[in-house]
């Protein structure tokens, strides 16, 4: 046993210090990024936000809308091959290039992944997703996927430390997914005592990934557009959003009525709700590590996306970054004791 004394920070612990700017308008800010990925060699450009691969966020309906904003969707792994086939035949190449195909790490998952990828050469992204990216089995699956799919962009996670980021990149990942426990409906930290404050994880993991020519995605912990800006400021190449995109018309979630008001259920993918739906319940040997909440219906997701993109542009103007690419270099974080004035409640 040992204790690390260094202070680790989450998004709520900091603000971004404003700096002199020559920008005249938020409209002058370019949010698109361009990446050439280490292993696949594929070059991609777009707005580096990703809808999370949760079954009430990473949906086909979400992918159709977000592609119009040049934003990615990690489509959840619970669609059948037949459902994928129907989706692929109903959308164009431009939508498919904004889609990540999510997979677990079982043999059945591997077979299904190959069947889905065979549907269209425009499906370029793979998202290998497990709660604990530190397992040897996970790394072996990643190596196998890289061998079979040399031209695909592989995003793999989740991890929170630099040495494991390096391990995954050297094993075939182009992008490493960073975050253990920060999600709005994740209870891993309270059930297990395991985790890492998200901003510090992003800063440390980005440093490790960039040293090897890889990228990271900050997954979890964003509750408002300012948190997204902080993630990019901390060095994230992509930011994945779950709760911020939940309960919209495109989420395909279950709608319930509470006190005469229509609500949508939103739950973590390790919650009892998710396991009851997809694997027949919580196994005897494990605990659920997610919770279920009911959220007011929020209408079309496009309004929320515009709000997030607007917040990002505004953050860039406050520090003089004409492009999102410049935000990290222009960011100085200051530690704070409070984030906002809540005399009239929390901001939306």
UniProtKB/Swiss-Prot annotation:
Q: Where is K(+) annotated to bind?
A: 181, 183
Gene3D superfamilies recorded: Aldolase class I
Give the record's GO CC terms: cytosol; GMP reductase complex
Task: Cite the entry's keywords alphabetically.
Answer: Metal-binding, NADP, Oxidoreductase, Potassium
Q: Which GO terms describe its biological process?
A: purine nucleotide metabolic process
- UniProt-annotated catalytic positions: 186 (thioimidate intermediate)
Q: What class of enzyme is it?
A: oxidoreductase
Q: What is its EC number?
A: 1.7.1.7
Reaction catalysed by this chain?
IMP + NH4(+) + NADP(+) = GMP + NADPH + 2 H(+)
A molecular function (GO) term = GMP reductase activity
Pfam families named in the record: IMPDH (PF00478)
Q: Which InterPro entries match?
A: Aldolase_TIM, GMP_reductase, GMPR, IMP_DH/GMP_Rdtase_CS, IMP_DH_GMPRt
For binding NADP(+), which residues are annotated in this chain's numbering? 108-131, 216-239
Subunit note: Homotetramer.
Query: What family does the database annotate?
Result: Belongs to the IMPDH/GMPR family. GuaC type 1 subfamily.
The protein's name:
GMP reductase
């Amino acid at each position: 046993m040992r204790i690390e004394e260094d202070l680790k920070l989450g998004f709520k612990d900091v603000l971004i210090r404003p700096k002199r700017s020559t920008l005249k308008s938020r409209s002058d800010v370019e949010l698109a990024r361009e990446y050439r990925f280490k292993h696949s060699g594929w070059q991609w450009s777009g707005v580096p936000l990703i809808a999370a691969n949760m079954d009430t966020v990473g949906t086909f309906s979400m992918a159709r809308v977000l592609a119009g904003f040049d934003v990615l969707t990690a489509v959840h792994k619970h669609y059948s091959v037949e459902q994928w086939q129907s989706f692929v035949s109903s959308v164009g190449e431009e939508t498919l290039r904004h889609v990540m195909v999510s997979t677990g790490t079982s043999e059945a998952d591997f077979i299904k992944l190959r069947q889905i990828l065979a549907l269209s050469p425009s499906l370029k992204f793979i998202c290998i997703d497990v709660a604990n990216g530190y397992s040897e089995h996970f790394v072996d699956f990643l190596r196998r996927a890289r061998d079979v799919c040399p031209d695909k962009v592989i995003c793999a996670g989740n991890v929170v430390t630099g040495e494991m980021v390096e391990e995954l990149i050297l094993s075939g990942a182009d992008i490493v997914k960073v975050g253990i426990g920060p999600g709005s409906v994740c209870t891993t930290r309270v059930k297990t005592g395991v985790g890492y404050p998200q901003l510090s994880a992003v800063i440390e993991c980005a440093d490790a990934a960039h040293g090897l020519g890889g990228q990271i995605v900050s997954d979890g912990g964003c509750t408002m557009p300012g948190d997204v800006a902080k993630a990019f400021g901390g060095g994230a190449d992509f930011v994945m959003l779950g709760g911020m995109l939940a309960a919209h018309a495109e989420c395909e979630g279950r709608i319930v009525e509470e006190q005469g008001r229509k609500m949508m259920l939103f739950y973590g993918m390790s919650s009892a709700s998710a396991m009851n739906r997809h694997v027949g319940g919580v196994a005897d040997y494990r605990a659920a590590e997610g919770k279920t909440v009911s959220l007011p219906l929020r209408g079309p997701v496009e309004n929320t996306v515009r709000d997030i993109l607007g917040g990002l542009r505004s953050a860039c103007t406050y520090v003089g970054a004409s492009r999102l690419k410049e935000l990290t270099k222009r960011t100085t974080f200051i530690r704070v004791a409070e984030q906002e004035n809540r005399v009239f409640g929390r901001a939306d």
